[in-house]
Swiss-Prot record:
Function: Plays an essential role in the viral genome replication. Participates, together with NSP2, in the formation of viral factories (viroplasms), which are large inclusions in the host cytoplasm where replication intermediates are assembled and viral RNA replication takes place. Orchestrates the recruitment of viroplasmic proteins such as capsid proteins to these factories. Participates in the selective exclusion of host proteins from stress granules (SG) and P bodies (PB). Also participates in the sequestration of these remodeled organelles in viral factories.
GO cellular component, one term: host cell cytoplasm
GO MF assignments: ATP hydrolysis activity; magnesium ion binding; nucleotide binding; RNA binding
Source domain of life: Viruses
Residue positions where Phosphoserine is found in the record: S67, S154, S156, S164, S166
Principal subcellular localisation of the protein: host cell
Species per Swiss-Prot/TrEMBL record: Rotavirus A (strain RVA/Human/Japan/AU-1/1982/G3P3[9]) (RV-A)
Pfam families for this protein: Rota_NS26
Record-given protein name: Non-structural protein 5
UniProt-listed GO biological process terms: viral genome replication
Binding, Mg(2+): D92
Entry PTM: Hyperphosphorylated on serine residues, when in dimeric form. Ser-67 phosphorylation by CK1 is required for the hyperphosphorylation of NSP5 dimer. Impaired phosphorylation is associated with a profound morphological change in virus factories and a moderate decrease in virus replication. O-glycosylated.
Entry keywords, A to Z: Glycoprotein, Host cytoplasm, Magnesium, Metal-binding, Nucleotide-binding, Phosphoprotein, RNA-binding
Cell location: Host cytoplasm
Length: 198
C-alpha cells in the first residue's frame, strides 16, 4: 500500500510511503532539482549544465547520465526541458511527460519496516481535598459535658413520687427511696442531654 502526494506548485516533491519493506532508512532520492543535485550532477556542475543544454532531450542517452541505469536515463529524458544557460538543467516538465507507472517517476521513497508508530503517554493527577475542620472552643466542649448535679440528700419533694411509681412496692418507705428517685431523675436528664447533643 502506497501513498503518493504530488505538489506541482511547490518544488515538485512527491513522496511514497511503502509499508512492510526491508529497509527502515530512506531508500531512494531521485527526481527533479533535489534529486539531480545529489545524483546526476557531476562535481563540475556548470560544465554539466552547459553540456546538457547543448543537446536536445531526444539526444540524451544513458551515457550522458551519472548512472547507466535505463530507468534513470529514461526519467532524465522524459523530464528534461531545455532552458537558458543561467537557469541550468531543468527537469520540471509537465506531468503528462512522466511514465504512467511509479517506476522512474520523480519521487522520494521512504521505506518503513512496520509503518508509523506513534506512542503518547498522558499522565494526569487530580487531587481533591474535602477536609473541613470544625473549630470548637474548649469552653463549648467542656460545657457539653457539664451535666446538672443533683444532690442525693435533697429535701425537695419533687423527686419523691407516690408508691404506685415505685417498683411494685419493693421500695415502700425505705430509707433509700429519696436517693433512688433522685438518681432516676438524674439519669433521665443525662439521657435527655445526650439526645439533644446528637
Amino acid at each position: 500500500m502506497s501513498l503518493s502526494i504530488d505538489v506541482t506548485s511547490l518544488p515538485s516533491i512527491s513522496s511514497s510511503i511503502y509499508k512492510n519493506e526491508s529497509s527502515s532508512t530512506t531508500s531512494t532520492l531521485s527526481g527533479k532539482s533535489i534529486g539531480r543535485s545529489e545524483q546526476y550532477i557531476s562535481p563540475d556542475a556548470e560544465a554539466f549544465s552547459k553540456y546538457m543544454l547543448s543537446k536536445s532531450p531526444e539526444d540524451i542517452g544513458p551515457s550522458d547520465s551519472a548512472s547507466n541505469d535505463p530507468l534513470t536515463s529514461f526519467s532524465i529524458r522524459s523530464n528534461a526541458v531545455k532552458t537558458n544557460a543561467d537557469a541550468g538543467v531543468s527537469m520540471d516538465s509537465l506531468t503528462q511527460s512522466r511514465p504512467s507507472s511509479n517506476v522512474g517517476c520523480d519521487q522520494v521513497d521512504f521505506s518503513l519496516n512496520k509503518g508509523i508508530k506513534v506512542s503518547a503517554n498522558l499522565d494526569s493527577s487530580v487531587s481533591i481535598s474535602t477536609n473541613v475542620k470544625k473549630e470548637k472552643s474548649k469552653n463549648d466542649h467542656r460545657s457539653r459535658k457539664h451535666y446538672p448535679k443533683i444532690e442525693a440528700e435533697s429535701d425537695s419533694d419533687d423527686y419523691v413520687l407516690d408508691d404506685s411509681d415505685s417498683d411494685d412496692g419493693k421500695c415502700k418507705n425505705c430509707k433509700y427511696k429519696r436517693k433512688y428517685f433522685a438518681l432516676r431523675m438524674r439519669m433521665k436528664q443525662v439521657a435527655m442531654q445526650l439526645i439533644e447533643d446528637l
